[in-house]
Amino acid sequence: RSNSNLAILLGLCLLTVCGGSTNRQFHHELEAEHYLRAGEYDKVLRVGEKSLEASRTLTAYRAVALSRLGKMGDRLFAYPQYYRSDGLFFETDSLHTLRYTNDSIYYLLGARPYTGEDRMVFLRNICYKGTGKYTSLDYYLSALLLEKKLDSFAQAVPDFYLPEDTLPRYYREALVM
């Protein structure tokens, strides 16, 4: 009898090990979320940094971490960007249960959009009206680059930066193009 109990226990242990979650993207999201909640923004950026796979959630976590570090214009494009400007925000899909939501990002930006307001219009408005925090400018300029709106980007930069200011790396590169 004890041998059969031991065999059942061993079988359950093997089942747990073999049948455990092997979704690498999900594990990256959980790890990044953990570091984000702990305020360890550099560690968020190291999660899955060598992988070419990046979920929208992980991409949004990286954007939040870069924004908190003030490095969005210098390092955003060092990571895969598969979702255009949508990757700066979390999915609003109710199937995804996240501790971080777009409300977290709106708090970071210092404003929230009106119901149904286009994100690009929202970001532009809070930058030009001055209702957002300083982080909103990086979100706006990065969104323009992610949407490949180089003309709008080139028009916006002089509105927010003085000629003698040192621009972040990717902003300088975009202006050269």
Predicted feature locations:
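Substrate-recognition/cap regions that form aromatic- and gly/pro-loop-enriched pockets
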Residues: 167-168
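Soluble catalytic regions of membrane-associated enzymes that act on cell-envelope
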Residues: 18-157
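Internal/C-terminal transmembrane anchor helices
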Residues: 2-23
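Long, compositionally biased charged/polar accessory segments in the mid-to-C-terminal portions
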Residues: 172-173, 177
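Active/binding-pocket-proximal capping segment
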Residues: 158-163
